[in-house]
């Protein structure tokens, strides 16, 4: 097991997945700043002025984390920053679920798809936080890797991200109700 945890391919896959997650989230927020400000404000955790500041700074911080994860010298602190951000996001979601405000959008990706918050989303963030903490903890033990490890790890991380993002997109689709479903083909 120890050899698996030291495998550079594992580290690059984990870092690439997290970097893609943060870069995509940041870029989607930067393209819809006003909408994202509304999402932050809708969580009702900060005063309006602070909500605007957070909405402006958060995508930049997410881009910095994404870049840091891909730079070996910065990967460990970037992974810790990723864990901190994911933990705060999970806490903000949990507070609103406890308040019964599950109809609000999480604001994870500003792709036109609304993702209502839930305990499942809190659990998802806990898993992502654990992944980021794992990346930070395992980095010092990683064996040096070659170009093949880097390329394969980045490809694996990208595929994992595409699967994750696809599942998120599908989760944001409105449910079809039997009463509104098409009867085509019958």
UniProtKB/Swiss-Prot annotation:
Main localization of the protein described in the UniProt heading: membrane
GO term, biological process aspect, one: methylamine metabolic process
InterPro entries in UniProt: Methylamine_util_MauE
TM regions (residue ranges): 8-28, 54-74, 75-95, 119-139, 153-173
Localization terms from the record: Cell membrane
Entry membrane topology: Multi-pass membrane protein
Pathway: One-carbon metabolism; methylamine degradation
GO cellular component labels: plasma membrane
Keywords, alphabetical: Cell membrane, Membrane, Transmembrane, Transmembrane helix
Pfam families per UniProt: MauE (PF07291)
Coiled-coil zones: none
Role description: May be specifically involved in the processing, transport, and/or maturation of the MADH beta-subunit.
Name of the featured protein: Methylamine utilization protein MauE
């Amino acid at each position: 097991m120890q050899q698996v945890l030291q495998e550079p391919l594992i580290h690059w896959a984990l870092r690439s997945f997290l970097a893609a997650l943060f870069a995509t989230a940041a870029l989607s927020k930067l393209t819809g700043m006003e909408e994202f400000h509304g999402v932050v404000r809708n969580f009702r955790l900060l005063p309006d002025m602070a909500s605007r500041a957070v909405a402006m700074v958060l995508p930049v911080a997410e881009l910095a984390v994404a870049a840091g994860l891909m730079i070996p010298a910065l990967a460990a602190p970037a992974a810790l920053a990723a864990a901190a951000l994911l933990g705060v996001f999970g806490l903000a979601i949990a507070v609103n679920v406890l308040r019964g405000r599950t109809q609000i959008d999480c604001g994870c990706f500003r792709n036109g798809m609304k993702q209502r918050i839930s305990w499942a989303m809190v659990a998802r963030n806990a898993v992502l936080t654990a992944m980021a903490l794992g990346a930070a903890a395992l980095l010092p033990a990683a064996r040096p890797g070659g170009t093949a490890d880097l390329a394969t790890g980045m490809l694996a991380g990208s595929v994992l991200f595409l699967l994750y993002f696809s599942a998120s997109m599908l989760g944001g689709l409105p449910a079809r109700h039997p009463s509104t479903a098409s009867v085509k083909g019958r």
